[in-house]
Amino acid sequence: MNNFLISLALQESSTEVQGGLFDFNATLPLMALQFLALTIILNLIYYKPLGKILDERDEYIANSLTAASAALSKANDLTKRYEQDLAESRKKAQDIIKNAQQDAQNIVSSKIKEAQKDADQLMSNTYDQLNIQKEQALQNLEKQVDILSNQIQIKLLGN
């Protein structure tokens, strides 16, 4: 049996093997042409449209980022402007309130001075009237004293 296996192995090694891994015959150029044709067809049908779509996508993303950046910049500028306007409005409102308080205080002061002046005038008039009434009362009293003294004199002398 060993002899049979050895003879079989010798027959196998003596026969010529065709179609190996690196066989250089007419199929090699045909395979190269098929590979080139497949590459060209795939390039035309698949890779160029895919590349175009990817380029459009990149352009869209770049445009979107640019637009978003511009919108953000504009929003920041508007925010700053509105904050400045708000601060200015608050300052104006505080100035208006301060002026209104000063005006109110001036009005109150003038009203107090006017009331004080009126009160002083009233006091002066009242004092003058009281002095006039006092003088009249004293004159009446003097008249009555004269009348009474005359009556007392008449009664004392006439009796």
UniProtKB/Swiss-Prot annotation:
Topology of the protein relative to the lipid bilayer: Single-pass membrane protein
Source organism of this protein record: Antithamnion sp.
Note: In plastids the F-type ATPase is also known as CF(1)CF(0).
Gene coding for it: atpF2
Any single GO CC term annotated in Swiss-Prot or TrEMBL for this entry: chloroplast thylakoid membrane
MF GO annotations: proton-transporting ATP synthase activity, rotational mechanism; proton-transporting ATPase activity, rotational mechanism
Keywords, comma-separated and alphabetical: ATP synthesis, CF(0), Chloroplast, Hydrogen ion transport, Ion transport, Membrane, Plastid, Thylakoid, Transmembrane, Transmembrane helix, Transport
Stated role: F(1)F(0) ATP synthase produces ATP from ADP in the presence of a proton or sodium gradient. F-type ATPases consist of two structural domains, F(1) containing the extramembraneous catalytic core and F(0) containing the membrane proton channel, linked together by a central stalk and a peripheral stalk. During catalysis, ATP synthesis in the catalytic domain of F(1) is coupled via a rotary mechanism of the central stalk subunits to proton translocation. Component of the F(0) channel, it forms part of the peripheral stalk, linking F(1) to F(0). The b'-subunit is a diverged and duplicated form of b found in plants and photosynthetic bacteria.
Name of the protein in question: ATP synthase subunit b', chloroplastic
Pfam families noted in UniProt: ATP-synt_B (PF00430)
